[in-house]
């Protein structure tokens, strides 16, 4: 199968490409970040340009996996930066739908948040447009994807679990947003990728799936698991969420509204996905070994 993967230079997109490469002809789309993956054909494109979409239509792909997404874009203020990112995401989905191919969309558990953020609205809009397109599709909503570093590629944005694991292994103190009792259901990138490929192989069922890992854990428990594997005992420092929100305003790649909602639970029960694909998502306790070296 010839696959187009948008966001091929992202952590999740690159791992998906690498996982698919042994059995599929994979074309990884990237824009500003150089990409080199074994067995994968890189293709630099700007999906906002019609001529680049025309190039993709000539590739002869069998399906597209849409991973690319913008969280924050340049703008004079927080609201305009979030809206600029949302507009880019609309343009990306415009391009994907124009290909008129079976589509797997890597969405997010943020669609379930009770707090209404521009990013969550953008994800919900993408899902709605894909459902209404008439194309065969599958929507997967991963919770906290994680996995080992790539051997031949460095994504522009450092994967958050790599940052957390490094702190646990090297720092005497690990700062945590709020009380750390909010829950995540981390999914290993190999399991997520295998689920995408299994759905494509069987024929897309035109429905959405939660794509979490095999266990739900509080942030405090996640840190404890990493610390046990690393044989470390760092101090966990719980800090007010407002401090992180203020810091996010100064960082080019962080959306303050997302940090403000960070204490929402992000659970993603994989039972229906497992039943559909025959896979079993590994618990974080097992997969976390890939984060501690």
Where in this protein do the model-derived segments appear?
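NAD(P)H-binding glycine-rich loop region in Rossmannoid oxidoreductase-like domains
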Residues: 41-99, 109-115
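A conserved pocket-lining segment of Rossmann-fold NAD(P)-dependent short-chain dehydrogenase/reductase
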Residues: 163-187, 195, 199, 210
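Mid/C-terminal beta-alpha module of Rossmann-like enzyme folds, strongest
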Residues: 198-257, 270, 276-293
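N-terminal Rossmann NAD(P)H-binding glycine-rich loop of SDR-like oxidoreductase domains
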Residues: 3-22
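N-terminal Rossmann-fold cofactor-binding loop
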Residues: 29-34, 47
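Conserved catalytic-site region of short-chain dehydrogenase/reductase
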Residues: 73, 109-121, 145-157
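Conserved beta-loop-beta element that borders a ligand/cofactor-binding pocket
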Residues: 128-154
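Glycine-rich "substrate-gating" loop/helix at the edge of Rossmann-like oxidoreductase active sites
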Residues: 146-157, 178-189, 213-215
